[in-house]
């Protein structure tokens, strides 16, 4: 029965190991119902994750229903777990020595885990200490390994101890395997978390790279649009600059014309002011002259009054001095003539004074009209000058802006011009090299033309010499034929090899020229047919001598 109970307990232990629970406190494992006294007792327990263990924690054997932790039978210090820093359950075990255990009996005990603060963190199932029965001390075993039919009789305690050690060893192996699997699971979970984090980071990076790529594409499109817009704006600005330059030139012309008009107006004003001064001076002179004439008129009036007084006195005297009338008649005539003259002078002076007053009034009216007209024109010119100054200021501001823009465009244009200048210098250098090469080829061409002309001259001299030699041979043959008129005229063959012997210098020159040949059409001689001879005379000529070099197309003067 005890063996069956032990097997059942072992099955329960394996089930507990295969299906662990995660209690909030300390859990005790492999607690038997009965422990044999005078043998050490091994206690297995688990510490859950999150519980802080200490070397001051202890495990005691208490009687069931004992309330105080001081009523323990025996205790041992708890062993701190080896994997306390890991996120898993810690498995530990302690041993109670045999001589500290309670005596056997029916009293039930259990294990308690007490921390350093005196709090009970876990209790085990109840168990008892009892002696084994005498009938059950021996166990019969069959020897399955040996071939003999033998029965082994061993003590039950030894058998149970061996079974317990085997179970403990198997349990330890299973616990190690479980811990290894748990560690592997934890490492795999960490690896999975790390890979998930790396995947999230890579996805975020990929998403950010896609956004950056799209942003770069949009920026590129925007930059292309801005570049096209800037090109359009640059073209518009160039047109605007040209238009503004033309407007500035026209405004400069207008300003020059306005300056000339202003200068003319200032000159007119100055001349009018001078004329005004002259008129004032003339007016003063006229006033002085009028006053002088007035004084003269007054003096003449006084003279007339005195003359009238004198006339009245003279009449009185005439009445009184009738006697002296005859003597004074001459004096009276003179006085009358003087009076007449004075009256005429007075009338002339009055006419002059009236003319001068009329002229003065006309001059003053004309001067006032001219002054008002000049004032109006000066005010209009002032307004025009103010407007022109404001317009000039605005044009100066716009011109300054256009100059700044033009300066920026000029900088760009200078850069492009520098690049084009560099390219132009390279093109010029290449052109100079091509020109030098062309000059060299032209010089070579001229040399070839000169050599060709020399060859043509030499060929012409050879043709003339051959013609002379042919004429001489023909004359000699003719003379021979005349001497042999009676005989039948065979076909004469005249060998001109002697001509080669006669001109060794020409042969040397032909050797210097190399393989040369004359055109047969140019050197062929049409010999005349004699009417007295029934057959033709054939003259054997030497091989044609001419330059075999064909003329190059570039040497042809028609192809130049």
Swiss-Prot record:
InterPro entries linked: CALCOCO1-like, SKICH, UBA_autophagy_assoc_protein
One GO BP annotation of this record: positive regulation of transcription by RNA polymerase II
Record region (Disordered): 480-517
Biased composition (Low complexity): 487-496
Coiled coil: 156-192, 367-480
UniProt keyword annotations, A-Z: Coiled coil, Cytoplasm, Nucleus
An example Gene Ontology CC term for this record: nucleus
Recorded GO MF terms: transcription coactivator activity
Family: Belongs to the CALCOCO family.
Main function: May function as a coactivator for aryl hydrocarbon and nuclear receptors.
Listed name of the protein: Calcium-binding and coiled-coil domain-containing protein 1-A
Recorded name of the encoding gene: calcoco1-a
